[in-house]
Design a protein with these regions (language model features):
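Conserved donor-binding/catalytic core segment of Leloir-type glycosyltransferases
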Residues: 55, 61-98
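Short hydrophobic beta-strand element within catalytic cores of glycosyltransferases
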Residues: 158-162, 171
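Donor nucleotide-sugar binding/catalytic pocket of nucleotide-sugar-dependent glycosyltransferases
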Residues: 8-60
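Nucleotide-activated donor-binding/catalytic signature segment of Leloir-type glycosyltransferases, i.e.
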Residues: 105-125
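A charged, aromatic-enriched C-terminal amphipathic alpha-helix characteristic of glycosyltransferases
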Residues: 183, 201-248
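Conserved acidic donor-binding segment of nucleotide-sugar-dependent glycosyltransferases
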Residues: 117, 173-174, 178-185, 193-200
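Acidic donor-binding loop of glycosyltransferase active sites
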Residues: 132-144, 157
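Short alpha-helical donor nucleotide-sugar binding micro-motif in glycosyltransferases
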Residues: 129-134, 223
Length: 250
């Protein structure tokens, strides 16, 4: 908004200083993807361990796929839902959009007759049903990790994702979906056409199995292992400091 545009430029330098000071006080960094680990290395000059977030695995029985594409998430500018709307409007493909946000009116204005907006009031069960029935899931945004592509894969649904950010670590091209190279409606449209032309017989079971790499059980195990290891490192550091202090006294 206009107030943010007026105030923020003068505060950015102070915020960068605060951010650097805060980062220097961090003992250990955990990144939610290798994409973010690289950014931590670039901006903070620090190494980090990668532990992927978790996703509830959709264990519902598989159903017949229907002839529509799906996108789920908040309707904000950086999600780039506009690319999915434009691509499917251009191709005359049915697209179901689940979510709400400030971009709703803008998206509806550019949408053709094949675009359906379901809003953000659906139950979890209803959303899972759309995940199960969708032909493919469209993910045009660039995100740190991106949980919705994993949710789609847990339903056995392939994902067509922009080939940057966390989606490059969760979507396997040719096995659980495709990447498209440019963050444009034309590039996404070309990816949709390729997906339909190739006619790859995706295995719902294999796609869901891949999503288990991001399960709640895996996350809990890795966090516990990480904390145990770091606690041992910390205790060893205390022991080393204690020995050093004794030697200094002698």
């Amino acid at each position: 908004n206009w107030l943010a545009r007026l105030v923020m430029p003068g505060q950015m330098h102070k915020m960068r200083i605060w951010d650097k000071c805060a980062a220097d006080r961090v003992d250990y960094f955990i990144a939610n993807s290798h994409y973010i680990a690289q950014r931590i290395k670039k901006y903070y000059r620090r190494d980090s361990d990668v532990i992927y977030p978790c996703c509830h695995i959709n264990e519902s029985p598989f159903v017949e796929k229907e002839d529509f594409y799906l996108t789920v998430g908040r309707l904000t500018w950086y999600k780039r839902v506009d690319l999915a709307v434009q691509a499917c409007t251009k191709l005359g493909k049915r697209l179901v959009v689940i979510g709400s946000g400030g971009e709703m009116d803008k998206l509806k204005a550019m949408a053709g007759p094949t675009i359906e907006f379901k809003g953000g009031g659906l139950t979890d069960e209803e959303v899972r049903g759309y995940y199960l029935r969708a032909k493919a899931f469209l993910f045009p945004g660039e995100e740190d990790f991106g949980i919705t592509p994993v949710e789609a894969q847990s339903a056995g649904t392939p994902v067509l994702a922009y080939g940057r950010g966390g989606a490059c670590e969760t979507v396997l091209p040719g096995k659980t979906g495709y990447w498209f190279e440019e963050q444009t409606a034309d590039s996404l449209a070309a990816c949709i056409q390729r997906f339909e032309k190739d006619g790859v017989a995706y295995s719902k079971e294999e796609i869901r199995e891949h999503s288990r790499a991001f399960s709640e059980e895996r996350f809990e195990r890795e966090i516990k292992e990480y904390c145990t290891r770091r606690m041992a490192d910390w205790q060893q550091e205390l022991l080393d400091c204690s020995h050093w202090e004794k030697e200094e006294q002698i």
